[in-house]
Each structure stands twice: as C-alpha cells, then as structure tokens.
C-alpha cells in the first residue's frame, strides 16, 4: 500500500514589482517573495505528481528539482545586501530555506524509513503519520516566523501589505487539509485491518485461544471506529473514504458476529475428532457402539470442514470486495482533491 507524503509549504505572497532595485523596500520584499514563489511552484508540481499516480522515477526527479530550487533560492536571497544595513528580513528568509531543505533531506529520509515498517503494527503506522504531521508543523512554524519578519520589515519601511491568499497558497492549504483528513480516516481503518491480520494468523495456526482473543479485539476496534466515523465531517462535501471505511468496518463486525462461530466450531470439532480417532485406533476389536461413535465423529468433522471452507470462501470474497472498494475510494479521493499542477 502506497502513502502520499507531502509537506505543507505555505507562504503569503505579496504583490510587488520584481526589478532588483534594492533601494526600494517594496522591490526588496518582491525579490524575496519571487524566490519563495518559485519554490512553491516546484513543490506543487512534486505534490501533484505524487498524488496523481506519476511514475516513481518522475516523482523523484521532481523532488530533486524542488531541492535544487530551494538551494538556488537560498543562494539568491543570501546574496542580497541588507536593506539599509538591516539584514533581519533577508536572514529570516535564508533560515527558512535552510529549514525547508533540511526537511526535504533529513526528515524526508526518516519518514521514508518509517514507511518501510509502518504496516507492521498500528503503533508504527500511527508514528509514521504523526511524523508527517510534525514535519508539516515544523515548516508551518518556520513559515509563521517568516511572515512575522515580513510584517516587521513592512512596518519599519512603510510598505502596505495586502493580506490575500494566492491561488498557489490555496492549493497548498488544500493539500495540507486533505492529508490531515485522510490520516484520521486511515488510522480508523488500519487498527481493525491490522487486528484482522492477527486473527487470520491465529486461524492459520489452529490457535483457538488466539482466535477468541483476536476476534474480540477486532470487534471492539471495528465498533469503536464506527462511532468515531460518525463524528467526522465530510471533506469539502466528500464523504467517500469515510463511507468506504464504514463498509470495511461493518465487514469486520459481520465477520466476528456471523462468521467466527463457524470457525470456532470447526476447530473444536477437529479437536474432538482427533481425540476420538486416537482412542479408536488403540482398539483392536472395537464394539459396534465404538464404531458408530467414530463414524459419527467422521461425519461431524466432514460437515464442519465443508461449512468452514464455504465460510472462508464467502469471507475472502467479501473482504476482497470491501478492500478493493476502500483502495479505489482512496485513489479517487486523492485524484479529486489534489490540485493538478505542472
């Protein structure tokens, strides 16, 4: 299962002329703003390609272009003189570019490493998604410091800032909000999804105690998830992944309540028959009653086996349908809500 990793890079751009006349405070700010805008465009190209199923090689190439743009912008800004000896605004912009570059390198590598083990447990998945959110928050905090420096510079030099969100900024905000929404739905899905894997493992090992313990946990997680889903509002009117998650959780509830009884009956019958067979094979001259009891045991295990196999076939079909529906909903959700940007 592939996850979309994105970073929030959201700067407020002010409209200035971009001639490199650093004697004019508006032009000074405009030059820095242009560098930030260039980075944001590369970011959106990378994010759009990641979300819309572009080949991994192309996505990685776009990430490298983003890194190059960050470095170039940082060098362009650091090469600026201070404005009338005041270097604070310039240095704040350079610091943010350094932060952004480090995030794309160091934090990105950590997240990729965490992704490799994220599916091993719910805790690992939660930590992976939380790491993504912390990285975005780190950038957001850096962005707030950058905006504060911009306001201080503007006030000090009598520049009138217009607080308006750009189209590019709107796109990046939507990506951020979309990811947060997806994370909360995904964790609701993943907890019982992983728990069912433990249940199926116990079934494969004929572990009756493990089956009972894991099915009870699965039922609890699925029911808890259904309650949580009821409190989550649709994303921009789109309830598709919540609905797909609900379908998946309802499958788990039905699996435990309606189907696990057949599984437990099979293993108990199998266990009883093993005892009957062992005792029967000890007898060199069994009585008619003993033969009848053995034959009944054979009939019981055959009946239980047939029911078990049919039960598994039904579950496998329903599980596959629900998972396909879930995966399709996730793909459609990202395709529909991630802005297309070249």
Could you describe each region identified by the protein language model?
Residues 1-27, 342:
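Bacterial Sec-dependent N-terminal signal peptides
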Residues 21-54, 115-211, 215, 270-342:
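C-terminal amphipathic alpha-helix
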Residues 38, 110, 188-191, 195, ...:
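Interface faces of extended alpha-helical assemblies
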Residues 43, 47, 74-77, 101-108, ...:
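A structural signal for well-ordered alpha-helices, especially hydrophobic packing surfaces
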Residues 47-130:
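Post-signal peptide N-terminal segment of secreted/secretory-pathway proteins
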Residues 67, 94-97, 101, 219, ...:
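Generic structural concept
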Residues 73-94, 113-114, 225-247, 261-270:
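Short, solvent-exposed, charged loop/turn and helix-capping segments
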């Amino acid at each position: 299962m592939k996850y979309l990793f994105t970073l929030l890079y959201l700067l407020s751009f002010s409209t200035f002329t971009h001639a490199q006349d650093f004697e004019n405070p508006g032009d000074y700010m405009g030059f820095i703003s242009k560098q930030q805008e260039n980075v944001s465009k590369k970011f959106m190209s990378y994010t759009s390609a990641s979300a819309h199923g572009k080949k991994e090689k192309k996505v990685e190439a776009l990430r490298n272009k983003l890194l190059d743009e960050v470095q170039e912008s940082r060098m362009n800004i650091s090469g600026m003189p201070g404005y009338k000896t005041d270097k604070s605004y310039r240095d704040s912009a350079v610091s943010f570019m350094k932060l952004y570059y480090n995030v794309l390198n160091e934090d990105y590598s950590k997240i990729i490493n965490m992704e490799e083990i994220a599916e091993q447990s719910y805790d690992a998945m939660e930590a992976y998604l939380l790491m993504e959110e912390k990285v975005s928050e780190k950038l957001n905090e850096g962005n707030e410091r950058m905006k504060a420096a911009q306001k201080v510079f503007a006030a000090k030099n009598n520049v009138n800032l217009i607080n308006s969100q750009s189209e590019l900024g709107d796109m990046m905000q939507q990506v951020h909000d979309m990811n947060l929404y997806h994370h909360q739905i995904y964790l609701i899905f993943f907890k019982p999804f992983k728990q069912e894997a433990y249940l199926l493992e116990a079934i494969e090992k004929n572990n009756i105690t493990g089956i009972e313990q894991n099915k009870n946990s699965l039922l609890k997680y699925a029911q808890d998830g259904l309650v949580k889903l009821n409190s989550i509002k649709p994303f921009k009117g789109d309830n598709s992944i919540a609905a797909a998650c609900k379908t998946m959780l309802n499958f788990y509830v039905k699996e435990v309540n309606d189907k696990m009884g057949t599984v437990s009956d099979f293993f108990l019958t199998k266990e009883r028959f093993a005892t009957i067979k062992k005792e029967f094979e000890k007898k060199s001259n069994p009585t008619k009653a003993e033969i009848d009891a053995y034959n009944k045991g054979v009939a019981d295990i055959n009946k239980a086996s047939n029911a078990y196999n049919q039960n598994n076939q039904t579950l496998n079909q329903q599980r596959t349908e629900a998972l396909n529906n879930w995966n399709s909903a996730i793909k459609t959700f990202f395709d529909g809500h991630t802005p297309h940007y070249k």
